[in-house]
From Swiss-Prot:
Classification via SUPFAM superfamilies: Small protein B (SmpB) (SSF74982)
Main location: cytoplasm
Record InterPro entries: SmpB (IPR023620), SsrA-bd_prot (IPR000037), SsrA-bd_prot_CS (IPR020081)
Subcellular location: Cytoplasm
Organism of provenance: Buchnera aphidicola subsp. Baizongia pistaciae (strain Bp)
UniProt-recorded name of the protein: SsrA-binding protein
Stated family: Belongs to the SmpB family.
GO process annotations (BP): trans-translation
Keyword terms: Cytoplasm, RNA-binding
Example of a GO cellular component annotation carried by this entry: cytosol
CDD domains for this protein: SmpB
Amino acid sequence: MKRNSNRKPNEICINRKAKYSFSIKETFEAGIVLLGWEVKSVRCGKINISNSYISLKNGEMYLVNSQFDPISKSNLYITYECNRIKKILLRKREITYLYSKLYKSHLTIIVLSIFFKKQWCKVKIGIAKGKTIKDKREHKKLSEWKKTQNRFVKRIRH
């Protein structure tokens, strides 16, 4: 089976929609508070972060709109909240820096990927600005041009 070349071995989920819809200015690595069944679903890859973003409440950051599907609903005593708001673990100075970017510069904070670093589940977040339709078209043209260039180079080599 062929491996996905742009995916690192420890990355569980990548938000591919983010690079198309946003221009990413900076990236950060942060911890995330998860329950036991959520960690199991992350390890199995049953998560969706395509529409998720980071919000700020009472000086703390939270992951909103992410969906963690449970592996099995065999436990009758636990109610699984798939769209639960999860706390993001950052240092105080990082939170103040992100707060200033969020409200003063009118940027958004989005989730780029979820991965494991040793045994800890981490989130890669990015400060991003939304692209206009014109920017999206230019991005699409550029990516298609790079693909055709690579095809020509392959033909010349062989």
